[in-house]
Amino acid sequence: MEEVFGKDMCDAWSNLVDAVMAGENTFACKDQHTYDWMMGQFPEHCLPILRELIDYAYDREHSVIDGVASFTWLVPPGEAKARIEAFGKQIEGILNEVLEDEYSDLEKALALYIYFSEHYEYDYDTYMQMNDKYVDYTSCYRFFQTGIGICHEISSAYSYLLMQAGVQATSMSGNRGYDKAGHQWSFVRINGKNYHIDPTYALGTRGELRYFMMTDEKRAEEDEYIPSTFYAVSHYSRENPHPDYTADDDTFRPLWDKDFESFSHETHTIRCWTESGYYGEWTEFEFDYAGY
């Protein structure tokens, strides 16, 4: 987040969270610009439940006066703190169910990718509604509570879980070439290299690895996404300087046409299957990810 939004916004976010947990309604913030972007972008990525608990200041255009920002409570402060703690336990429960302490960052990303493909569903009803009207109820938090969602909810939830597990992760957005439709997926940095992961496209596949640890080229290939439209985290990154987020390491190319079966932390191998031959025979394949 700091690479895209800068230190001032990250500091304001930390101050906001401290104020919420203390039951206050003011916090230190540099200026209105910092406030607007931080309040608009950070909760969904960094503490999804917060949108249910607080809102902007009553006087939205003058939310920051002399370096002090304010916000409004949607629920009593005590209830907010209790709900944040309950949400934290929910997230901890998912991570404890899916991950082991000894997992590497790659193994965490893989285990959660498979978990998403097997446990969550795409919300087609909401997707269809969005073609006809503005929908304002989608959020990462809704996805965790219902188990269904659309792309921005799903990818935000996947990236949020990875961040809580210590993996560098965020969201990436872009447009398809054939209909210009927007889409959001996850973007990770593992072993100092960047990769695209699309947990939305993985839903219901029961472990197809074609959307896991993709390069820019592979991301573009899967449903004709246009690399020049890619942007990280939010529209803010389109307007402000940030590091290059090129994903060009194709170490995981051998997995993209395989179906997952299992992986071994001890041997650093992924066991999977591939369909080949005239009669569609299934052949076992083992991928060595030593070093990851």
Tell where the protein language model's regions lie, with residue ranges.
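Sterically constrained small-residue positions within well-ordered secondary structures
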Residues: 18-20, 62, 142, 177, ...
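N-terminal accessory/pre-domain segments preceding catalytic cores
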Residues: 1-106, 222-292
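Secondary-structure boundary elements
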Residues: 81-143
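Alpha-helix capping and helix-loop boundary segments enriched in small/acidic/polar residues
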Residues: 4, 82, 146-149, 173
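Active-site nucleophilic cysteine motif
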Residues: 109-112, 146-162
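Flexible, active-site-adjacent loop/turn segments at secondary-structure boundaries
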Residues: 141-142, 148, 210
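Catalytic cysteine-centered active-site loop
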Residues: 126, 130, 137, 148, ...
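Hydrophobic/aromatic-rich core segments of domains that either
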Residues: 153-221
